[in-house]
Amino acid sequence: MFAEVLTIGDELLTGHTVDSNSAFIASKLTEQGYWVRRITTVGDDVEEIKAVVGEILARKPEVLVISGGLGPTHDDVTMLAVAEALGRKLVLCEKCLERIKAFYEKLYSEGYIDDPSLNEGRKKMAYLPEGAEPLENTGGAAPGAFIEHKGVKIFVLPGMPREMKAMLEKEVLPRLGRRKFLQRKFLAEITDESKLAPILREALERFNVRIHSSPKGFGKYIGLIIFAEDEGELEKTVEYLESRGIRLEEA
Protein backbone atom coordinates (compact mmCIF):
# COMPACT_ATOMS: atom_id res chain seq x y z
CA MET A 1 0.00 0.00 0.00
CA PHE A 2 3.04 2.26 0.14
CA ALA A 3 4.26 4.43 -2.73
CA GLU A 4 7.07 6.88 -3.32
CA VAL A 5 7.41 9.80 -5.72
CA LEU A 6 10.64 11.04 -7.31
CA THR A 7 10.75 14.32 -9.21
CA ILE A 8 13.78 15.20 -11.29
CA GLY A 9 15.13 18.53 -12.51
CA ASP A 10 17.79 21.09 -11.66
CA GLU A 11 15.13 23.79 -11.96
CA LEU A 12 13.28 22.27 -9.00
CA LEU A 13 16.37 22.46 -6.79
CA THR A 14 17.19 26.06 -7.69
CA GLY A 15 13.66 27.26 -7.03
CA HIS A 16 13.12 28.44 -10.60
CA THR A 17 10.23 25.99 -10.94
CA VAL A 18 7.78 25.07 -8.19
CA ASP A 19 7.33 21.31 -7.92
CA SER A 20 3.59 20.98 -8.42
CA ASN A 21 4.00 17.54 -10.03
CA SER A 22 4.74 15.70 -6.80
CA ALA A 23 1.66 17.15 -5.09
CA PHE A 24 -0.57 16.10 -7.99
CA ILE A 25 0.91 12.61 -8.17
CA ALA A 26 0.64 12.13 -4.40
CA SER A 27 -2.99 13.25 -4.34
CA LYS A 28 -3.92 10.82 -7.12
CA LEU A 29 -2.08 7.93 -5.49
CA THR A 30 -3.83 8.69 -2.21
CA GLU A 31 -7.20 8.62 -3.97
CA GLN A 32 -6.29 5.19 -5.36
CA GLY A 33 -5.61 3.85 -1.88
CA TYR A 34 -1.82 4.20 -1.63
CA TRP A 35 0.01 5.91 1.20
CA VAL A 36 2.82 8.04 -0.18
CA ARG A 37 5.67 7.46 2.23
CA ARG A 38 8.26 9.81 0.71
CA ILE A 39 8.62 12.47 -1.97
CA THR A 40 12.18 13.04 -3.16
CA THR A 41 13.63 15.61 -5.57
CA VAL A 42 16.97 15.27 -7.31
CA GLY A 43 18.74 17.16 -10.10
CA ASP A 44 19.54 16.13 -13.67
CA ASP A 45 22.54 13.99 -12.82
CA VAL A 46 22.82 10.32 -13.75
CA GLU A 47 24.74 9.27 -10.64
CA GLU A 48 22.44 11.18 -8.29
CA ILE A 49 19.33 9.70 -9.89
CA LYS A 50 20.80 6.19 -9.78
CA ALA A 51 21.65 6.55 -6.11
CA VAL A 52 18.21 7.82 -5.14
CA VAL A 53 16.40 5.15 -7.18
CA GLY A 54 18.51 2.52 -5.45
CA GLU A 55 17.64 3.93 -2.03
CA ILE A 56 13.94 3.94 -2.87
CA LEU A 57 13.97 0.37 -4.17
CA ALA A 58 15.73 -0.76 -0.98
CA ARG A 59 12.68 0.48 0.96
CA LYS A 60 10.48 -1.78 -1.23
CA PRO A 61 7.47 0.42 -1.99
CA GLU A 62 4.75 -1.14 -4.08
CA VAL A 63 4.81 1.80 -6.49
CA LEU A 64 7.43 4.34 -7.55
CA VAL A 65 6.39 7.23 -9.78
CA ILE A 66 9.22 9.23 -11.36
CA SER A 67 8.63 12.52 -13.18
CA GLY A 68 10.97 14.66 -15.26
CA GLY A 69 14.00 14.48 -17.52
CA LEU A 70 12.60 12.68 -20.59
CA GLY A 71 13.14 15.35 -23.24
CA PRO A 72 15.64 15.68 -26.11
CA THR A 73 18.27 17.89 -24.44
CA HIS A 74 21.65 16.90 -22.98
CA ASP A 75 20.41 17.10 -19.39
CA ASP A 76 17.40 14.84 -19.95
CA VAL A 77 19.03 11.72 -18.53
CA THR A 78 16.27 10.05 -16.51
CA MET A 79 15.73 6.98 -18.72
CA LEU A 80 19.47 6.30 -18.81
CA ALA A 81 19.78 6.68 -15.05
CA VAL A 82 16.79 4.45 -14.33
CA ALA A 83 18.09 1.78 -16.71
CA GLU A 84 21.50 1.80 -15.03
CA ALA A 85 19.93 1.75 -11.55
CA LEU A 86 18.02 -1.41 -12.54
CA GLY A 87 21.01 -3.03 -14.23
CA ARG A 88 19.35 -2.87 -17.65
CA LYS A 89 20.32 -1.59 -21.07
CA LEU A 90 18.60 1.19 -22.95
CA VAL A 91 16.94 -0.27 -26.05
CA LEU A 92 15.24 1.37 -28.99
CA CYS A 93 11.44 1.27 -28.96
CA GLU A 94 10.50 1.25 -32.65
CA LYS A 95 6.87 2.04 -31.88
CA CYS A 96 7.98 5.05 -29.85
CA LEU A 97 10.27 6.23 -32.64
CA GLU A 98 7.40 6.15 -35.13
CA ARG A 99 5.19 8.14 -32.80
CA ILE A 100 7.92 10.71 -32.17
CA LYS A 101 8.43 11.03 -35.94
CA ALA A 102 4.69 11.59 -36.45
CA PHE A 103 4.61 14.12 -33.60
CA TYR A 104 7.30 16.33 -35.16
CA GLU A 105 5.84 16.00 -38.65
CA LYS A 106 2.55 17.28 -37.26
CA LEU A 107 4.28 20.24 -35.62
CA TYR A 108 6.04 20.95 -38.92
CA SER A 109 2.79 20.81 -40.92
CA GLU A 110 1.18 23.24 -38.49
CA GLY A 111 4.09 25.68 -38.76
CA TYR A 112 5.44 25.32 -35.21
CA ILE A 113 8.89 24.04 -36.25
CA ASP A 114 10.97 24.40 -39.41
CA ASP A 115 12.53 20.93 -39.47
CA PRO A 116 10.67 17.67 -38.75
CA SER A 117 13.66 15.37 -39.18
CA LEU A 118 14.66 12.95 -36.43
CA ASN A 119 17.87 14.41 -35.05
CA GLU A 120 19.82 12.66 -32.29
CA GLY A 121 17.99 14.50 -29.51
CA ARG A 122 14.61 13.42 -30.82
CA LYS A 123 15.75 9.83 -31.41
CA LYS A 124 17.08 9.68 -27.85
CA MET A 125 13.54 9.88 -26.50
CA ALA A 126 12.68 6.53 -28.14
CA TYR A 127 15.12 4.59 -25.95
CA LEU A 128 13.63 2.87 -22.90
CA PRO A 129 15.04 0.52 -20.25
CA GLU A 130 15.10 -3.06 -21.50
CA GLY A 131 11.81 -4.80 -20.73
CA ALA A 132 9.90 -1.55 -20.19
CA GLU A 133 6.41 -1.05 -21.53
CA PRO A 134 6.03 2.33 -23.29
CA LEU A 135 3.43 4.73 -21.95
CA GLU A 136 1.70 6.93 -24.51
CA ASN A 137 2.23 10.67 -24.26
CA THR A 138 -0.90 12.25 -25.73
CA GLY A 139 0.38 15.80 -25.28
CA GLY A 140 4.05 15.61 -26.20
CA ALA A 141 6.85 13.67 -27.86
CA ALA A 142 8.58 11.71 -25.11
CA PRO A 143 7.00 8.39 -24.13
CA GLY A 144 6.91 7.27 -20.54
CA ALA A 145 7.84 3.81 -19.28
CA PHE A 146 6.38 1.14 -17.02
CA ILE A 147 8.75 -1.38 -15.48
CA GLU A 148 8.11 -4.09 -12.91
CA HIS A 149 11.30 -4.70 -10.96
CA LYS A 150 11.56 -7.05 -7.98
CA GLY A 151 7.98 -6.44 -6.94
CA VAL A 152 8.03 -2.67 -7.45
CA LYS A 153 5.88 -1.05 -10.12
CA ILE A 154 7.98 1.78 -11.58
CA PHE A 155 6.44 4.49 -13.75
CA VAL A 156 8.61 7.07 -15.52
CA LEU A 157 6.67 10.13 -16.66
CA PRO A 158 7.50 13.45 -18.35
CA GLY A 159 8.08 16.57 -16.29
CA MET A 160 5.81 18.91 -18.23
CA PRO A 161 2.74 19.12 -15.97
CA ARG A 162 0.19 18.86 -18.78
CA GLU A 163 1.88 15.78 -20.24
CA MET A 164 2.50 14.21 -16.83
CA LYS A 165 -1.11 14.63 -15.69
CA ALA A 166 -2.54 13.08 -18.85
CA MET A 167 -0.15 10.14 -18.69
CA LEU A 168 -0.82 9.57 -15.00
CA GLU A 169 -4.58 9.55 -15.53
CA LYS A 170 -4.63 7.47 -18.72
CA GLU A 171 -1.64 5.16 -18.37
CA VAL A 172 -0.67 4.84 -14.70
CA LEU A 173 -3.82 4.80 -12.59
CA PRO A 174 -5.61 2.15 -14.70
CA ARG A 175 -2.60 -0.15 -14.17
CA LEU A 176 -2.80 0.31 -10.41
CA GLY A 177 -6.51 -0.10 -9.88
CA ARG A 178 -8.37 1.34 -6.92
CA ARG A 179 -7.72 -0.16 -3.53
CA LYS A 180 -10.06 -0.07 -0.58
CA PHE A 181 -9.14 3.11 1.22
CA LEU A 182 -11.18 5.28 3.52
CA GLN A 183 -10.61 8.81 4.67
CA ARG A 184 -12.71 11.10 6.81
CA LYS A 185 -12.09 14.75 7.56
CA PHE A 186 -12.84 16.33 10.93
CA LEU A 187 -12.44 19.54 12.85
CA ALA A 188 -11.16 18.80 16.35
CA GLU A 189 -12.33 21.34 18.90
CA ILE A 190 -9.02 21.96 20.61
CA THR A 191 -6.76 24.98 20.35
CA ASP A 192 -3.39 23.57 21.41
CA GLU A 193 -1.80 21.11 18.99
CA SER A 194 0.77 20.10 21.59
CA LYS A 195 -2.02 18.75 23.82
CA LEU A 196 -3.58 16.87 20.91
CA ALA A 197 -0.29 15.28 19.81
CA PRO A 198 0.05 12.62 22.56
CA ILE A 199 -3.57 11.56 22.10
CA LEU A 200 -3.05 11.12 18.35
CA ARG A 201 0.13 9.16 19.02
CA GLU A 202 -1.78 6.79 21.31
CA ALA A 203 -4.48 6.35 18.66
CA LEU A 204 -1.85 5.45 16.06
CA GLU A 205 -0.41 2.83 18.40
CA ARG A 206 -3.82 1.29 19.06
CA PHE A 207 -5.37 1.27 15.59
CA ASN A 208 -4.29 0.54 12.02
CA VAL A 209 -4.82 4.06 10.73
CA ARG A 210 -2.89 7.14 9.68
CA ILE A 211 -3.80 10.59 10.95
CA HIS A 212 -2.90 13.93 9.41
CA SER A 213 -3.35 17.05 11.52
CA SER A 214 -3.30 20.65 10.32
CA PRO A 215 -3.65 23.54 12.76
CA LYS A 216 -5.85 26.44 11.71
CA GLY A 217 -3.69 29.18 13.16
CA PHE A 218 -4.61 29.78 16.80
CA GLY A 219 -8.31 29.35 16.21
CA LYS A 220 -10.81 27.07 17.86
CA TYR A 221 -10.21 23.99 15.68
CA ILE A 222 -7.47 21.73 14.38
CA GLY A 223 -8.13 19.86 11.14
CA LEU A 224 -7.79 16.07 11.14
CA ILE A 225 -7.85 13.54 8.31
CA ILE A 226 -8.03 9.89 9.35
CA PHE A 227 -7.00 7.29 6.75
CA ALA A 228 -7.78 3.58 7.07
CA GLU A 229 -8.31 0.45 5.01
CA ASP A 230 -10.95 -0.88 7.39
CA GLU A 231 -14.08 1.04 8.37
CA GLY A 232 -14.13 -0.59 11.78
CA GLU A 233 -10.63 0.67 12.55
CA LEU A 234 -11.63 4.16 11.48
CA GLU A 235 -14.75 4.15 13.65
CA LYS A 236 -12.83 2.85 16.67
CA THR A 237 -10.29 5.63 16.20
CA VAL A 238 -13.03 8.27 16.18
CA GLU A 239 -14.62 6.75 19.29
CA TYR A 240 -11.26 6.67 21.05
CA LEU A 241 -10.49 10.31 20.30
CA GLU A 242 -13.91 11.36 21.56
CA SER A 243 -13.43 9.24 24.71
CA ARG A 244 -10.28 11.28 25.36
CA GLY A 245 -12.33 14.46 25.34
CA ILE A 246 -11.70 15.53 21.74
CA ARG A 247 -14.92 16.83 20.21
CA LEU A 248 -15.00 16.06 16.48
CA GLU A 249 -17.10 17.65 13.77
CA GLU A 250 -17.24 16.28 10.23
CA ALA A 251 -15.47 18.72 7.92
Curated annotation (Swiss-Prot):
InterPro entries: CinA, CinA_Arc, MoaB/Mog-like_dom_sf, MoaB/Mog_dom. Signal peptide: none annotated. It comes from the Archaea. SUPFAM superfamilies: Molybdenum cofactor biosynthesis proteins (SSF53218). NCBIfam families: molyb_syn (TIGR00177), PRK03670.1 (NF002977). Belongs to the CinA family. This is Protein TK1472.
